[in-house]
C-alpha cells in the first residue's frame, strides 16, 4: 500500500481510515489537526457553518426557529448514528466510533438524545424514500434553504444538492460521530 503524505488530507475521526491508522500504530508517525471551522461559499461570501451544539446557539445568523429545526434534525441523526455504531459493535464489526461516552466531556450532543424509543418521531422521520435527494429529505425535515445548503455541503460533505439522500445521510452520520471524538475541540477530527 502507498499513502501520499505530501499534502494535507481530510480524514474524519470516525472514518474507517483513521481507525485503521490507530489500530496499526501508524498514527504515532503522523500529525493530526482538528477542523476548527467549516465554511459554505454562497453569493460571494464564505459563511461559517455551525457544526456542534454550542455553535448553533452562538450563530446570530439563524433565527430561533431555524436553530430548533437544525438541533432537532442533528440530534435525530446523532441518535441514529449511535444506534448504528452500537449495532456494529454488538455484531462484532467495528464500533470504535463510539469511544466517547454520550454525555461525557467531549460529547457534543448530550446524553438523553441517544436514548430514544421506536416510537420517536424524529427517528422515524430519518427514513429515506427510494430515490429521494438530500435537498428533498432536508426540506421534509423543515430546514430552510440556507440550512439545507450548510448541512449538505459543509456537514455531509456533498458536492451537489441533488445527491442521493441515503449516501449523504451516511456521510453526515460519520461527520457527526467525528465531532469532538478526540476531545472537546470544535469540528471533526
Residue ranges and their predicted role:
Residues 1:
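Switch I (G2) and immediately adjacent beta-strands of P-loop GTPase domains
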Residues 5-7, 18-187:
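Rossmann-like flavin
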Amino acid at each position: 500500500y502507498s499513502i501520499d503524505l505530501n499534502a494535507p488530507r481530510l480524514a474524519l475521526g470516525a472514518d474507517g481510515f483513521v481507525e485503521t491508522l490507530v489500530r496499526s500504530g501508524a498514527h504515532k508517525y503522523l500529525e493530526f489537526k482538528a477542523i476548527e471551522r467549516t465554511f459554505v461559499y454562497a453569493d460571494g461570501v464564505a459563511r461559517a457553518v455551525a457544526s456542534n451544539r454550542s455553535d448553533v446557539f452562538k450563530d446570530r445568523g439563524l433565527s430561533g426557529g431555524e436553530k430548533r429545526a437544525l438541533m432537532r434534525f442533528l440530534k435525530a441523526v446523532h441518535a441514529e448514528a449511535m444506534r448504528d455504531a452500537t449495532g456494529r459493535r454488538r455484531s462484532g464489526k467495528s464500533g470504535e466510533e463510539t469511544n466517547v461516552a454520550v454525555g461525557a466531556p467531549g460529547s457534543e450532543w448530550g446524553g438523553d438524545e441517544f436514548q430514544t424509543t421506536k416510537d420517536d418521531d424524529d427517528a422515524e422521520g430519518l427514513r429515506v424514500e427510494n430515490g429521494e435527494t438530500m435537498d428533498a429529505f432536508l426540506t421534509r425535515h423543515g430546514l430552510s434553504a440556507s440550512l439545507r445548503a450548510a448541512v449538505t455541503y459543509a456537514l455531509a460533505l456533498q458536492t451537489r444538492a441533488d445527491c442521493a439522500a441515503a449516501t449523504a445521510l451516511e456521510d453526515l452520520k460519520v461527520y457527526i460521530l467525528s465531532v469532538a471524538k478526540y476531545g472537546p475541540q470544535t469540528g471533526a477530527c
